[in-house]
Amino acid sequence: MHCAQYTAGRCRSCQWLDKPYPQQLADKQHHLESLLAGHAVTQWLAPVFGRESAFRNKAKMVVSGSVERPLLGMLHRDGTPVDLCACPLYPPSFEPVFTVLKTFIARAGLTPYNVARKRGELKFLLLTESTYNGELMLRFVLRSETKLAQLIAALPWLQQQLPQLAVISANIQPVHMAILEGEREIPLTEQQALPERFNQVPLYIRPQSFFQTNPQVAASLYATARQWVQEHEVHSMWDLFCGVGGFGLHCAGPETQLTGIEINAEAIACARQSAEQLGLKNVSFAALDSTRFATAEAQIPELVLVNPPRRGIGRELCDYLSQMAPKFILYSSCNAETMAKDISLLAGYHIERVQLFDMFPHTSHYEVLTLLTLRR
């Protein structure tokens, strides 16, 4: 993959861009195998990968420059702006959208935030595309509500230029820190959920809910989880740290007793919407802390699926699972190092199979799916 900004030394987000892609996969697989070297693994499956470019469904753009000539991209270490509108990780559909958005910023008078001077209003633009129908979700991250009325007044022009804009919102982030978004989200369109579909399973993305940024590989990850669960004829399961419910909704059959737990209420609203659309009657989702929920339960299902943030599931949940001993633990991780530490704490379990999913080409990061079975 060629990137002009990488070649010029202005962007190093893709740290491994100089490394041939087959070597990237081999290095990631070696890293994963070394982390689990102390455990017996029954089956290592070949890594799953997708496109090497144009695979991202989301852009996080720092807004800089002036209101008349805004720049979208990132800030270099020395504070100079780097234009990322032509980033090869984005689909071709994004660049013309960015062109319109630059014009809109000028029309609406949305002054870009200046980090050095701590002045201005528009900090970020967050753009997400649905691979299901091509609709877009756009979030304006503002320092305050000062320019909100101007933004709303100018929206009809933007919606006319970009009819695929289905979900628009403003996020208020008043803190002068490298924090992407604040707690307050202001909806600017009636529709506030972007429809997506993986493997015939309807999913929804709301402004403040997490969603995988590589749809092609994410669809393979969910399909693989479903296959592994179905092979063991599981009738009851938990989906902890469930997000919008992607794993649980793929794995649950009409008779499966599924409980999905996620701290983010927006994500839970998405999961419930999907479950209702699928007609699943034995499925429930709740906006709770996953560890607190689990450790308060006196009974355990046959399978516990966990998809934690980078910190892993931690000792408290590992101790609980070891004590309660579900037949299966399906662990999906975006940080194999914390997953390996957690597995070492899960007494009484054997690693049945492991598979790497390269969600993040040209970087050292990857996702991994691991099936643990209780030793008989």
From Swiss-Prot:
Keywords assigned by UniProt, alphabetized: 4Fe-4S, Iron, Iron-sulfur, Metal-binding, Methyltransferase, rRNA processing, S-adenosyl-L-methionine, Transferase
Binding residues annotated for S-adenosyl-L-methionine, in chain numbering: 212, 241, 262, 307
Iron-sulfur keyword on record: yes
Highest taxon listed in the record's lineage: Bacteria
Catalytic activity: uridine(747) in 23S rRNA + S-adenosyl-L-methionine = 5-methyluridine(747) in 23S rRNA + S-adenosyl-L-homocysteine + H(+)
Active-site residue list: 334 (nucleophile)
Molecular function terms, GO-annotated: 4 iron, 4 sulfur cluster binding; iron ion binding; rRNA (uridine-C5-)-methyltransferase activity
Pfam families attached to this UniProt entry: tRNA_U5-meth_tr
EC id: 2.1.1.189
Family annotation (InterPro entries): 23SrRNA_MeTrfase_RlmC, MeTrfase_TrmA_AS, MeTrfase_TrmA_CS, SAM-dependent_MTases_sf, U5_MeTrfase_fam
Any single GO BP term: rRNA base methylation
Residues that bind [4Fe-4S] cluster: 3, 11, 14, 87
Family recorded in the similarity comment: Belongs to the class I-like SAM-binding methyltransferase superfamily. RNA M5U methyltransferase family. RlmC subfamily.
Protein name (record): 23S rRNA (uracil(747)-C(5))-methyltransferase RlmC
